[in-house]
């Protein structure tokens, strides 16, 4: 049994965490982490990306990750931490933009969309590859979160999507199913070369949120 994060002497004990399983953090824990980080993120954007400025955090983003994750038995708290890493605290200073509601770089390969990309049965009123942009765009925050969770589900298990869950990830079928049951198994798969990718999600974002104190950043 893993120790409580506040009692853990070494974060590496969490490197064996599975993608599937129960949340350890609550939505309130994750929201408190974002709230505590806001001043730091505002400074970061002002200093490094003044032309972009601060983008408000998506509404209810922590709760959405927790609740949608439960539907798929995916650890939504870790998925949230991955989203924080991928988006730069939801500031999107890379090629994916905040209005795309794409929290994990889904479909963003570094080459701009042509608009001819396959949607593989995904409702195009909910998701699209907009020509000239990078990666998928979703019409709501909720759809974007669920697509992220589904992509993790593809890596973590060979099971079909849970009943009553609509496919939102057009890249779901491109994943070798079940190849990454652990977060650290995403190394070299989700990100290339991706050395230490899973460890970074756990250590630099999730563990920091779990050990939040008044002096954070």
Set out the residue ranges of the language-model regions.
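Catalytic cores of secreted/periplasmic lytic hydrolases that degrade extracellular macromolecules
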Residues: 2-217
């Amino acid at each position: 049994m893993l120790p409580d994060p506040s009692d853990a002497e070494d974060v590496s004990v969490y490197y064996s965490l599975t993608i599937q399983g129960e949340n350890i953090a609550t939505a309130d824990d994750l929201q408190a982490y974002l709230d505590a980080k806001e001043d730091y993120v505002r400074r970061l954007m002002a200093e490094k990306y003044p032309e972009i400025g601060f983008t408000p955090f998506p509404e209810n983003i922590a709760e959405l990750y927790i609740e949608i994750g439960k539907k798929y038995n995916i650890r939504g708290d870790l998925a949230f931490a991955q989203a924080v890493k991928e988006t730069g605290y939801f500031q999107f200073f890379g090629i994916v933009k905040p209005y795309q509601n794409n929290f994990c770089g889904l479909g963003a390969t570094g080459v701009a969309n042509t608009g001819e990309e396959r949607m593989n049965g995904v409702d195009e009123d909910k998701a699209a590859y907009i020509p000239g942009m990078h990666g998928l765009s979703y019409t709501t925050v909720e759809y974007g979160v669920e697509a992220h969770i589904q992509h993790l589900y593809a890596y973590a298990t060979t099971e079909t999507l849970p009943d009553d869950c609509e496919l939102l990830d057009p890249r779901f079928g491109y994943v070798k199913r079940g190849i990454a049951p652990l977060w650290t198994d995403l190394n070299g798969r989700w990100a290339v070369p991706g050395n230490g990718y899973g460890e970074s999600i756990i250590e630099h974002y999730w563990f920091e949120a779990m050990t939040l104190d008044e002096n954070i950043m």
